[in-house]
Amino acid sequence: MLRNKVRKTDTLIALNEVYESIQGEGLLVGLPSVFIRLQGCNLRCPWCDQPEALSFSGRKVKLSSLINELKKFTAKHIVITGGEPFAHRELPFIVEFLLSEGYSVQIETNGTLWVEEMEKFAEGIHITCSPKGVAKYYVHPKILKYAKELKFVVDKEFSKEVLKKEEFERFLREGKVVLQPESNRKEMMEKALKIQKELLKECYTVRVIPQVHKCFDLK
């Protein structure tokens, strides 16, 4: 068992950056958090605010080094973001060690990918799925099963009808849908509020939450 643990700590992680801030998006907004940004994404979203994290090339660090770096921070909530976390086969090792060290774990994902070894941890973490606002967008069934919320970026192309896809109905019914105005732009805030009002008439309550960290000029 100890030998396996040592081997896992030698696992190389494609890491973009680690930093402490507040969670500025979604249902856990305001929570003091340490962000682990993994390097590499399978999508190319036009409004992506982290283009430097898209490529799969870049520095790699041992998991043991990452764990040591986390000890410099005071927050005990970890947000694994990217890039796309589920594009990394090493993700289960990261989550396992974080949970064993007493951290709470949140993963921000575009929802298109899944790593089977994550199933044993999925119930005990907070998965935030951010589907893109187009009708034919695919979300992996396991992500839909374990996600705690759906977060949609409301941009010029976003349509309310996307929210009514059959696979999203549970989240609408349970009030676990967040509309995030693109880049906190005024016209997108107005659009999100309009959609929220229309959905209220259909007995669905969604939340409109801007990128709060940007309001405080935080990372």
From Swiss-Prot:
Signal peptide (from-to): none
CDD domains: Radical_SAM (cd01335)
Binding site for substrate: I22, Q23, G24, R37, T81
Plastid in keyword set: no
Keyword presence, Chaperone: no
Catalysis: reaction(s): 6-carboxy-5,6,7,8-tetrahydropterin + H(+) = 7-carboxy-7-deazaguanine + NH4(+)
Pathway field: Purine metabolism; 7-cyano-7-deazaguanine biosynthesis
Pfam families with a match to the protein in the record: Fer4_12, Radical_SAM
Domain Radical SAM core per the UniProt entry, residue ranges: 28-219
Record protein name field: 7-carboxy-7-deazaguanine synthase
Species of provenance: Aquifex aeolicus (strain VF5)
Name of the gene encoding the protein in the UniProt record: queE
